[in-house]
A protein has these predicted regions:
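Regulatory and interdomain segments flanking nucleotide-handling catalytic cores
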Residues: 4, 8, 17-246
């Protein structure tokens, strides 16, 4: 290890970087403490207290994964993403979950309600892993998606940020829902017109083309396809029989 650290040749520039080995302290009794200190410098960031928390998870390079799926909407893929969103809401106690296309949003009222005590590094790494596992397991129900999972190894990235108040948290969801509606119009248009016909067209113009030339009324498309789906945790009253209670 020390030899590797001592010399490193730069093949492009043809010179060697030398690390002074005297600066490397190999004291066994505090090595672990030092390494943990270095780790903490980049992994100990905490969210701010008493502020809403918003998480967005995106499928990485899902344009490749979705190639060859039914257009404009593949119902198996839609079903899988809805299941992933529900799984995340259940596992993280999120106040609200929202899914559109290959994207999932989660929210908590404040940092104290978020998982992992609001540790940013944990939130981003674990939530991305949870989404990936749920997606893969749910894809296994469908042969077409199962084959894609085996070939492409899909995964998710995750970003976390906070809003100054609950109104802005709600606006974050409005932002994503508006994006979903624009994308839905575009996807339906791309399934019915050539790239040349759509070039330079606005969302409103594509919507009008669909109605006038193809007889497709965007309002007739199912809401969860054109605007996404919301999931929330609710309290329910359940009557338990004696056998269940025993």
């Amino acid at each position: 290890i020390l030899q590797c650290l001592k010399e490193k040749k730069d093949e492009k520039n043809g010179f060697v970087f030398v690390v002074n080995l005297k600066d490397i302290k190999m004291i066994n009794d505090n090595l672990g403490d030092r390494m943990k200190t270095y780790e903490a410098l980049t992994t100990s960031t905490m969210l701010m207290p008493r502020l809403p928390v918003y998480v967005r998870l995106d499928g990485r390079a899902f344009h490749t994964f979705c190639r060859g799926l039914d257009k404009p909407f593949d119902m198996e893929f839609v079903a899988v993403m809805r299941e992933v969103c529900q799984d995340l809401v259940k596992q993280t106690n999120a106040k609200l979950g929202y899914v559109q296309s290959d994207e999932i949003s989660l929210a908590w009222e404040d940092m104290s309600k978020a998982p992992f005590d609001g540790r940013l590094f944990k939130l981003t790494s674990v939530l991305a892993s949870m989404a990936t596992v749920s997606f893969v397991l749910n894809c296994m129900k469908y042969p077409k998606l199962k084959e894609k999972v085996e070939n492409l190894k899909p995964n998710f990235d995750c970003r976390v940020f906070q809003l100054p108040n609950m109104i802005e948290l709600a606006n974050a969801f409005v932002w994503r829902e508006n994006d979903a509606a624009r994308n839905a119009v575009s996807m339906v248009a791309q399934a019915n017109f050539s790239h040349k016909e759509l070039q330079g067209k606005s969302t409103a113009e594509m919507n009008e083309m669909l109605f006038q030339e193809k007889g497709i009324n965007f309002n007739d498309i199912k809401p969860f396809l054109k605007r996404g789906s919301y999931f929330k945790r609710v309290n329910v009253m359940k009557v338990l029989d004696e056998e269940t209670l025993s």
